[in-house]
Amino acid sequence: MLGNKLSISDLKDIKNKKVLVRVDFNVPIENGIIKDTNRITATLPTINHLKKEGASKIILISHCGRPDGLRNEKYTLKPVAETLKGLLGEEVLFLNDCVGKEVEDKINAAKENSVILLENLRFHIEEEGKGVDANGNKVKANKEDVEKFQNDLTKLADVFINDAFGTAHRAHSSMVGVKLNVKASGFLMKKELEYFSKALENPQRPLLAILGGAKVSDKIQLIKNLLDKVDRMIIGGGMAYTFKKVLNNMKIGTSLFDEAGSKIVGEIMEKAKAKNVQIFLPVDFKIADNFDNNANTKFVTDEEGIPDNWMGLDAGPKSIENYKDVILTSKTVIWNGPQGVFEMPNFAKGSIECLNLVVEVTKKGAITIVGGGDTASLVEQQNKKNEISHVSTGGGASLELLEGKELPGVLALSNK
């Protein structure tokens, strides 16, 4: 499914066409200043390609924040137009709405080959289909209005390109409702689909999944789906304590214990056995007497267990040593979830050592993919983004793909 979608590279005839590009400019803006421009920079290859191919107008649409279907200047995309202007080295026309006669007229009047940024899609309740009214009450958009909004977006251009992988799991109007004949992925979306297709549909083996995160119950769907695909699985992070307590009757002190998740541990291990998947769990832990970077700490083995009133906050050195061979002999690695509370420097070592091993196996030619969210933040923090095959830009979207779900924004693209 992922590999057979039309992409921007397949489009031969863009010259003199108006192109509508759904991008992800959901960036943190404080007092009109953009705090992180990564998502804007990431769209430049798609925009520059369309300019080079002679597109008549390049019309960018995006959401930003959660204005809930109401106009809210806090979430205006105007500052993004300024940043984009600096990055492209040319004027970017900003329009203060994203649909309607005035927008259509201004697009048509704009100069050839120009870049136009429209205002936040989510200022219209029809984008998400729900929001709040002026009094803060929850409201739903009616079907006719949603249909009209989608038709109004469709009217703006001749070709549609979706480059917003981070929103691909949302069936919002701009993701699934543009009714143009040609709907292709941009370079960002294309790269995401290619890497996930390599890992999930046609992997080089052995295929390893490294999972972390707090709750087993949040990751059940993920674990079950990956057990159908992988050869090996490392289960670490907060959810490891639930596994260790259930499987080894280990004392876990005040470490995270997921009551609901604990009931499924047996079933997960049964499935792993049936599917011939090796499961690796930590065997030692860095523990603390408080959830605090400056807490007292010590290392314990799983045999010793964690004393009362202490909690496990990172994997210990023996665990990482055990993972070394597992990681370095894998040909494909999917990593979703850190091994400890890496946000606190004293409990980051397990995750950082794990990252270094993933970097090492990438150098040996393995394909390595980091799902969005916390693990991507860790890679960013350690400045290792260029040393991993692919760091996903979509937390929720990549998680749903790994869970085996189809993404509405991807399904809506044209097939090759």
From Swiss-Prot:
CDD domains: Phosphoglycerate_kinase. InterPro entries: Phosphoglycerate_kinase, Phosphoglycerate_kinase_CS, Phosphoglycerate_kinase_N, Phosphoglycerate_kinase_sf. ADP binds at G213, G237, F342. Gene3D superfamilies: Phosphoglycerate kinase, N-terminal domain. It is an enzyme of class 2 (transferase). ATP binds at A214, K215, K219, G238, G312, T375. Pfam families: PGK (PF00162). CDP binds at G213, D218, G237, G337, F342. The keyword RNA-binding does not apply. (2R)-3-phosphoglycerate binds at V23, D24, F25, N26, N38, R39, S62, H63, G65, R66, L121, R122, H169, R170. Its EC number is 2.7.2.3. One of its GO terms (cellular component) is cytosol. Keywords: ATP-binding, Glycolysis, Kinase, Magnesium, Metal-binding, Nucleotide-binding, Transferase. GO terms for biological process: gluconeogenesis; glycolytic process. Monomer. This is Phosphoglycerate kinase. It comes from Plasmodium falciparum (isolate 3D7). The gene is PGK.
